[in-house]
Amino acid sequence: MDHGGAREWMVVDAAEHMEIGPALARKYDFLIIEDDPYYFLQFEKPWAPTFLSMDVDGRVIRTDSFSKILSSGLRIGFLTGPKPLIDRVILHIQVSTMHTSTFTQIMISQLLQQWGETGFLEHIDRVVEFYRTQRDAMLIAADKWLKDLAEWYPPAAGMFLWIKIKGVSDTQQLIMEKALQKEVLLVPGGAFNINSSEPSSYVRASFSLCSPAQMNLAFKRLADLIKEAL
């Protein structure tokens, strides 16, 4: 399960039906891989529950990432799960990629030891506040330029805004050709389908590093392109 922080579609599941996943895993004898790299970037507390927190018989393997909360260049994640399964993963890594960068592993290890749990959570709070400010700036720009052209929900976590373009059945050409010509970098929704060739009316916008002025200009240009396409 990887929802990229877009928990607006997960609210009901988190509140009422998250137990269904582990229950189905027990009933039909399968494992759950919970891919949740944006978990620590939730904008409200208490944080949403995880499948791992509900696991009672070792069926959940959870993946997290330091790349989203420390530095994107680190490219290091970590697994949490039952020891027999993690041991098999370790054996696989030893005969494939060997391991991630030793230097970056040492950096993270030393940093976490120096911070401790309290220091780590204080860092998370600062990161979340940064992304909350970025999200709010993007929502202002979206409301200004896309209000009558698209639909979206305020993201509850992460660094992306998931936008549905009204009247456009497939955003591939709009984003990968016309938007690029206007120096607007977005990702067409089809990239997130199981079959990426299937049409999608969605677009993903990142608010990780853009300034409010850049967001405003990008959505103005996107609005003009949408109007031309309709």
Indicate residue ranges for each PLM-predicted region.
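PLP-dependent class I/II
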Residues: M1-L230
